[in-house]
Amino acid sequence: MGYQQKLPGLVMSTGLLSTVLLGAMCPAWAADYKQAPMLDEQVKAGKLPAVATRLPEKPYVETMIDGVGKYGGTLRTTILANGDQYNLTRTIANELLVRWDPQWKKVGPSLAEEFKASEDATTYTFKLRKGLKWSDGQPFTVDDIMFWYEDVFMNNALSPAKNPTFTVAGKPVKVTKIDDQTVEFKFESPYGLFLQQLAYGQGHLPVIYPKHYLSQFHEKYNKEGIPALLKANPAAGDWVALFNSKISLTFQPPFWQNLQLPTLNPWVLTVPYADSERVVATRNPYYWKVDTAGNQLPYIDGITWAKLDDPQLMALKMTSGEFDFAFRHINNATFKSVLFDGQKTGNYRFVDVKDLPANDAVIQLNLNSTDPVKRKIFQNKDFRIALSHAINRQEIIDLVYVGQGAPAQVAVQPEHELFNERQAKQYTEFDPKRSAEMLDKIMPKKDAEGFRLDEAGKRFTINFMVADVFGLSYPDVVQMVQKYAKDVGIDIQLRTTDRARLNTMWYANEQDAYIWNCVGGLSEVYTDPRCYMPFQKADIFFAMKWSEWYSNRSTGEEPPESVKALMAAYDKVNAAVTDDDRRQKMKDFLNLSADNFLNIGISRPMPKYMMTSNNLKNVVNGIPITGNLWHPAPTLTQWYFDKPTK
């Protein structure tokens, strides 16, 4: 039996927009809920309410691939020492109003047990499960969502740029409380993709702001108490910085450094992602899901992440049996042979995952550079084309990726109906002669060493920031790009860094260029086109100021007409109500994106996998974990140890 949640679902079509979708009905065994044995003593001592009281009236019911599991055990895994908060997000943080099913086929209920949408795709209504609770036992209601909306999202000090998930054509959503359990999201124009967006990426925003906890740090609610709090938190210069130090998006550091922050996640941190040698989480006693036998989830008691600096060390520790689960940074061709050979000694198996981004290695020049000379050159499409032709992609793939991959630009994968061959293949031919000829028209003068001079007569140098992440050997890739660029007169200086430092540079708009992978290889291109246009999402900052402008038209910088046309084309994708209309508009958008050619891709993605202990059950095979889908977090609650350790 495959993993499923036996409910009507909403696929990409919005033809059922007026239909109310119901969550799991209240089980017949509601009076006989069961809990993990580790909680028994707390309940007996009166330190914790009974499990039936902790659960909502209609908990979400999970159906498992291997059946009802067993309680107990600690899941051992690993995380990079710095800047790898995405690892935590993908493991324990994906609780949303609505959710994609694990096979990415349909959107269904989650925290909202019912939801409906208007026929014109402008109004969406959600009914929360009654009795939901934060991890500290306090009620989660519509008031928490309204706190996010009125006091965070619409507060220009806290949210100067509005998150695009909750805007249409630069205009923010209007959120209205109907009652304690019912909330309405209304847009000024059609937003046919809203449910899909809400189940993806940054759709967690409305449900991560506990009002009862965070209001103490908000000037509106505690103006008189803020000075004392600032004195106790000297690193925060004002109430805005103080508030932002207590909460953030789930893939940003503050979310994982504040142990006092209540959440709706299945596990809560007891050791933060900070200076310790490991990160530790224990079960949330108020988690709101059960299995078909009435057992409160999750099955596994706790999770530990060993903090390591080196992906190679991660792989070696996996083969020696020190981890029960791993997938980030080592699930690629670089480590596959070692990990395959180590399955017996490490007592683990390979599990297929569907992780197909738009490209595994993408050169992203900062089109909004604060250096006016570099900005002008980076924004010149012919410069980007010339640099693209200078790169010997096949040589990189052969030497760095042991032949796994194919030369390609940022593009939807060939297996998908939206595949655009022109977009995938344009400017990928290794042609240094053509590259040099194009560059001669842009920067004809050279210095004594053969490097090109900019219009001010200075050597044109690209400072390339490189973080060794995902196990994709980015430093090795950029060293080869550096050589190819030198052959056509472009000076690239490689600056190695870690992800945390790179994050800081992105948000300050300080980088010249960097290399990263790009989402959008499959259907997430509809909801997450961040590599195809300036779009305010995590990790992709090739045109941050333009993406800020796109989100609300009042911040950032107005882009050129060609980019504005690209943004307008995506607005049409968002507004489309039917599948056919949306599909055609997305094809139009991708054609415009190909015309703009904003980023330089190197290699089509390699097959991915994850490793799980042979002792782990209910592990879904072939799960998509691409982009901001945040898998495998939605299925981790059903994992269990066949022989849990005491």
Locations of regions flagged by a protein language model:
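Detector for C-terminal structural segments
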Residues: 59-60, 261-262, 267-279, 283, ...
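Short, well-ordered beta-strand elements
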Residues: 66, 71-81, 113, 123-126, ...
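A structural "hinge/loop" feature
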Residues: 66-91, 111, 194-203, 364, ...
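Surface-exposed binding/hinge segments that line
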Residues: 164-246
